[in-house]
Amino acid sequence: MGWPPPSPYEDGPVPTGKQSPFTALDFQLVLLRRMADHNPGPVEDARRRLGVSLADMREANKRWQAMVRSPRSRPALSRYRSVLGEPESRTPRRIGDLDCEAWRWPVPLWPGLRFEVLTAAAGGAVWNEWLVRAPGAEPPALRTVEDLTPWSCTVDEAARAFAPARPLEGSAPTRWGLAFTAPDASGVRREVVAEFTWGLLQRTEVSGPRP
């Protein structure tokens, strides 16, 4: 054997121990991971379309949670920009006496939706983060309980279609709930509790008829 001995890495890159950058694809896996609690079937289909494994999805979620909880974590808005890039749009809004901005990014997995972050107009704190319908995209026709299928609508769309809707506290930070009445296909009004993850409908509990 000659000297020096051949490097064990001469046929490939030397491992550095560094993780690859967290990408927009990874963020979509984070969205799916929480949705898998209620809809494993659609999530599995979506994961296959993205060409990633179950282990990839779990690892992406693990890395995201570590980023969020780290004492050295960057502010939420900066974190989204680092992962998703510059927003597709920044729209001024006024909610009560507060001036804010809605930042929106495209989500390739759901072309008709956008990921929206609501933040103070001067930047800084993030007040809300969820999926909303993309500008110009056709909204769903929500008329009956049967129209409320998984992933069919956003929180805002359900609240408008079946007003007045009562907000409910979610079971996790990325979950929301709505309680409202809606007719079934026979016209009988039912009590409905709808649960959303990242702003997208996941499941409903229907009881009734309303007294």
Model-derived features: positions:
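A short, surface-exposed helix-loop junction/capping segment
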Residues: 55-62, 133-143
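Mixed-charge, Lys/Arg-rich low-complexity intrinsically disordered regions
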Residues: 144-148
